[in-house]
Amino acid sequence: MGQKGCPIGFRTGVTKKWRSLWYGNKQEFGKFLIEDVKIREFLRKKPSCQGAAGFVVRRMSGKIEVTIQTARPGLVIGKKGAEVDLLKEELRKLTGKEVWVEIAEIKRPELNAKLVADNIARQIERRVSFRRAMKKAMQSVMDAGAVGVKIQVSGRLAGAEIARSEWYKNGRVPLHTLRADIDYAAASAATTYGIIGVKVWINLGEKASTASSNVGTAAPVVQ
């Protein structure tokens, strides 16, 4: 059952950076964690953040800084920054604290597992053949310079009575090599036959440990 581990969590603190950058004592930790979850759930539901690949939450002296990683920064910023200002105000009401919003543009969306998974899911919802969507995505990922890619879809594929899983793989995608920079994400497609799950693994090559000194620490450390 060694394959069941999440590649992101497995490498956090080794070659992957924390997505929550703050420290909380016993009294604060639970409150901060729940607040983080609420912030992420709120942002995922916002139309302006639909193209976002991830969110990084950082806390400092009563303030919260949220970094939105997206391939479409213009959509998040809005006309003359209107969308960002609205996000700040809504997050301030949600948390009761001052919130800063930063935008980090993803230069190569073809190498981001979350964006690739979401793209496949949206195609399946538009009734595009799941095999065609998978193969096209794999080709785009490899053309962008990835070392390897694996894509899996699960559910009532093509309306079949019995749910099953199918996957395609190209190149190398090691699961237990910590120095391998593996990006992983999952998405879901809502179809008339039910939910179709999509998982994507992208091998970006080997990477030296960037946080070896943080391994075993009790809480996230600001990078």
Curated annotation (Swiss-Prot):
Functional note: Binds the lower part of the 30S subunit head. Binds mRNA in the 70S ribosome, positioning it for translation.
For this entry, the protein name equals: Small ribosomal subunit protein uS3
Can you tell me where the transmembrane regions are? none
Origin species: Chlamydia abortus (strain DSM 27085 / S26/3) (Chlamydophila abortus)
Name a GO CC annotation attached to this entry: cytosolic small ribosomal subunit
The alphabetized UniProt keywords are:
Ribonucleoprotein, Ribosomal protein, RNA-binding, rRNA-binding
Q: Which PROSITE patterns match?
A: KH_TYPE_2 (PS50823), RIBOSOMAL_S3 (PS00548)
Q: How does it assemble?
A: Part of the 30S ribosomal subunit. Forms a tight complex with proteins S10 and S14.
Q: Which Gene3D superfamilies did the record assign?
A: 3.30.300.20, Ribosomal protein S3, C-terminal domain
Q: Which GO terms describe its biological process?
A: translation
